[in-house]
A protein has these predicted regions:
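Start-of-helix register in tetratricopeptide repeats
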Residues: 55, 89-92, 126, 160, ...
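Alpha-helical segment of the N-proximal tetratricopeptide repeat
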Residues: 52-83, 92, 99-103
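Canonical tetratricopeptide repeat
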Residues: 93-96, 130, 164, 198, ...
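Short coil turns that delineate tetratricopeptide repeat
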Residues: 51, 85-88, 122, 156, ...
Length: 277
């Protein structure tokens, strides 16, 4: 006689409970799984037209650069470059390519392109400045200073050249020379620290430990020139950064007039944990 396993009757409520538990368990697991987000749709830019004039291609490249579409901008700049035969015109476009590469932090590529621009027109100051920026970002401050000085020799009216020179000198801890360069930059353009250079990337003080002293130096320069609002702004930054000699503001001659301003008194009275006693 054949033997069959006895059928076991399971209450429906138990089965339903198991199903519910399974669903709950699955739901709990799904919440721990990584959620895959689809990448955003890429913005497509039409390639440069082979029939477009160099000026139109350059204008479009400038627009793309302004929109931060840097790869597309470079494509258009290179297309414009291919239509030019005069070295001075080529240098202008090469400098713009260099500028875009620097914004993208492609320092090596930027250096090579700047050098090509200099070779095309050695009387054009901007690529010297931009080459200096690339060297500065590589912490080659001495080499950067050399390039900034070359740019200034060719054009001593560009505030950004002096500002960049000041930053490189500051990083070399040549503070007096740095202050002179910064002062000249401010004389040429009081807004120089608020903007980038006309065809390049304005250098900044890289090390956090230098930032407080930099802000204090700029505050002194603005105070000396009578720009109270901006002096107080940078003085506040220096305080917040914990500048160790902040109390020198009570005696530095550059702040003589500013000390008569009640806002100076209020600022100095502020209690800030970062401010050394």
């Amino acid at each position: 006689m054949a033997l069959y396993p006895k059928a076991v009757l399971v209450p429906v409520t138990i089965v339903a409970s198991c199903v519910c538990l399974s669903v709950v368990s699955t739901a709990q697991i799904s919440r721990t799984d990584p959620v895959q987000v689809k990448p955003p749709l890429l913005r497509t830019i039409d390639p440069p037209s082979p029939d477009a004039a160099a000026t139109d291609l350059e204008k479009r490249a400038d627009e793309l650069h302004g929109q931060k579409l840097y790869f597309d901008a470079i494509d258009y700049y290179r297309a414009a470059l291919g239509k030019l035969s005069i070295p001075a015109d080529q240098a202008k476009i090469l400098n713009k390519i260099c500028r875009t590469q620097l914004v993208m932090t492609r320092w090596h590529d930027g250096k090579k392109t700047c050098q090509q621009a200099i070779k095309a027109n050695r009387k054009f100051p901007d690529p010297y400045n931009n080459l200096g920026v690339a060297l500065y970002e590589e912490k080659k401050y001495g080499a950067a200073i050399k390039q900034y000085r070359k740019a200034i020799e060719l054009d001593d009216s560009a505030a950004s050249f002096y500002s960049n020179l000041g930053a490189a000198l500051f990083s070399k801890k040549k503070f007096e020379e740095s202050a002179k360069a910064y002062q000249r930059a401010l004389e040429l353009d009081p807004d120089v620290f608020e903007r980038s250079s006309r065809q390049g990337v304005q250098a900044q003080v890289p090390r956090p430990e230098d930032r407080a002293r930099y802000d204090y130096t700029v505050a002194k320069l603005y105070a000396k020139m009578g720009f109270s609002e901006r002096s107080l702004e940078y003085l506040r930054k220096a305080m917040e950064e914990g500048y160790k000699d902040f109390k020198d503001a009570y005696k530095d001659e550059e702040f003589a007039e500013l000390r008569k301003d009640k806002r100076f008194t209020e600022l100095m009275a502020m209690k800030n944990p970062a401010l050394p006693e």
